[in-house]
């Protein structure tokens, strides 16, 4: 680039000098010509003048060529310099940007590694008992996620009737299909099946009640539980009542009779739940007798006491019993004292039972008030006690309210395994005791 600049400058500088030298040469030749030989004007015009003019024109053309070449060289040099400046300018910020981004990425990477190491050391190496409660929710959510994934995997392994036990999205329709399948496979038609007598069920219930009565007589379970209940509620008794004592407990000698059992769809369930309607009839005497004193505080506290004896007996009970298997998700508790651990957290099936509002309960209330002059079987007291018992029963066991009983697991377990004791086992146990 520097050589081209020097050549252009030399051409520009030498152009005028060269033309001047050519004119001076012509003058000198003309002068010399006058000294040596004299030329005529015609010869000069015909011979010498054209040569001189041609030389002048050539010199002028050369000068123009030199000027154009110099200008083109200068313009080319300027364009080359501009292009070099444009190419160099964006390269410098790009290199600076790349170096800056590399430094930032390196710093961010190192910081992320340090934070990860601190997290691991804090929560996995130096974790204490207090942090366990703080992370209980996260652990619970993780365990629930693991359980769900485990159940989804096991559902592909467990089969039902040769089919995969996969979960069904439409659970409502699946329940109705399951009920229809049960009725079909057990050959039970809800619409046309006749009521059953349940004689075999009466025998089983009678054996269970008999065993319950034997234990109550031998171990005084009912009496002990009633005394404990009275002691726990003694602080809630009003001040005008003395201590309550149990005088009689009659557990009866007869058994309930179940009959006319039919299976039907539960109302308001859209054929998604079955229930059993069973007539129950009990003719027996179930009695509870207590005695206490009514403390009179006039004219001064504890100046007089009025003895009271009450005996309440159930002599007849007739009703229609409704029994169904369900889950606790389908109903809501009516009491605020319901424990969340008893219902809601324990998944499983419950035995639901209730009685029809058209039930019959016959009560006998015997009352005796006074020490010397006694008032016996006062109707007002009998009606008041009957009303309170009926109210208690309706609020707990009469439709639309139900009672739930959690069903235990029916899977065989080793701790529940037993075998019948024989005479040899008795003799061996006696010898070991001796």
From Swiss-Prot:
Keyword match Membrane: yes
Organism: Kluyveromyces lactis (strain ATCC 8585 / CBS 2359 / DSM 70799 / NBRC 1267 / NRRL Y-1140 / WM37)
UniProt free text on domains: The SMP-LTD domain is a barrel-like domain that can bind various types of glycerophospholipids in its interior and mediate their transfer between two adjacent bilayers.
GO molecular function terms listed in the Swiss-Prot or TrEMBL record: lipid binding
Region (Disordered): 415-434
Gene symbol of the encoding locus: MMM1
Transmembrane helix among keywords: yes
InterPro entries per UniProt: Mmm1 (IPR027537), MMM1_dom (IPR019411), SMP_LBD (IPR031468)
Membrane disposition: Single-pass type I membrane protein
Identification of the protein by name: Maintenance of mitochondrial morphology protein 1
Function: Component of the ERMES/MDM complex, which serves as a molecular tether to connect the endoplasmic reticulum (ER) and mitochondria. Components of this complex are involved in the control of mitochondrial shape and protein biogenesis, and function in nonvesicular lipid trafficking between the ER and mitochondria. The MDM12-MMM1 subcomplex functions in the major beta-barrel assembly pathway that is responsible for biogenesis of all outer membrane beta-barrel proteins, and acts in a late step after the SAM complex.
One of the protein's GO biological processes: mitochondrion-endoplasmic reticulum membrane tethering
Topology feature Lumenal, residues: 1-105
Pfam families associated with the record: MMM1
Compartments reported by the entry: Endoplasmic reticulum membrane
């Amino acid at each position: 680039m520097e050589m081209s600049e020097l050549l252009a400058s030399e051409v520009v500088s030498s152009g005028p000098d060269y033309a001047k030298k050519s004119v001076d040469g012509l003058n000198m030749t003309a002068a010399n010509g006058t000294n040596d030989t004299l030329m005529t004007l015609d010869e000069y015009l015909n011979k010498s003048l054209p040569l001189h003019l041609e030389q002048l024109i050539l010199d002028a053309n050369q000068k123009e060529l030199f000027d154009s070449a110099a200008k083109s060289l200068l313009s080319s040099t300027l364009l080359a310099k501009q292009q070099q400046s444009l190419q160099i300018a964006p390269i410098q910020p790009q290199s600076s940007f790349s170096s800056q981004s590399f430094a930032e990425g390196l710093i961010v990477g190192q910081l992320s590694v340090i934070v990860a190491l601190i997290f691991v050391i804090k929560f996995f190496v130096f974790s204490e008992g207090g942090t366990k409660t703080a992370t209980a929710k996260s652990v619970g959510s993780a365990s629930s996620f693991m359980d769900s994934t485990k159940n989804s995997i096991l559902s592909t392994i467990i089969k039902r009737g040769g089919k995969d036990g996969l979960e069904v999205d439409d659970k409502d329709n699946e329940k109705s299909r399951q009920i229809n399948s049960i009725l079909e496979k057990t050959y039970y038609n809800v619409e046309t099946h006749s009521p059953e007598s349940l004689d075999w069920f009466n025998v089983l219930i009678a054996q269970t009640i008999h065993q319950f009565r034997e234990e109550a007589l031998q171990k005084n379970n009912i009496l002990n539980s009633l005394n404990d209940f009275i002691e726990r509620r003694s602080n809630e008794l009003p001040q005008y009542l003395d201590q309550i004592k149990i005088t009689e407990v009659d557990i009866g000698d007869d058994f309930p009779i179940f009959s006319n059992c039919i299976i039907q769809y539960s109302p308001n369930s859209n054929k998604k739940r079955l229930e059993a309607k069973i007539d129950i009839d009990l003719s027996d005497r179930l009695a509870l007798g207590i005695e206490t004193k009514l403390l009179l505080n006039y004219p001064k506290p504890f100046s007089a006491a009025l003895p009271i004896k009450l005996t309440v007996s159930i002599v007849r009970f007739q009703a229609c019993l409704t029994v169904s298997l369900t889950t606790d998700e389908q109903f809501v508790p009516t009491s605020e004292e319901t424990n969340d651990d008893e219902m809601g957290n324990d998944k499983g099936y419950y035995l639901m039972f209730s009685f029809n509002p058209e039930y019959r309960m016959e009560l006998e209330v015997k009352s005796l008030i006074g020490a010397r002059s006694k008032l016996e079987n006062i109707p007002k007291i009998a009606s008041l006690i009957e009303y309170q018992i009926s109210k208690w029963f309706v609020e707990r066991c009469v439709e639309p309210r139900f009672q739930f009983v959690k069903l235990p697991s029916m899977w065989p377990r080793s701790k529940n395994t037993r075998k019948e004791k024989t005479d040899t086992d008795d003799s061996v146990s006696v010898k070991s005791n001796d």
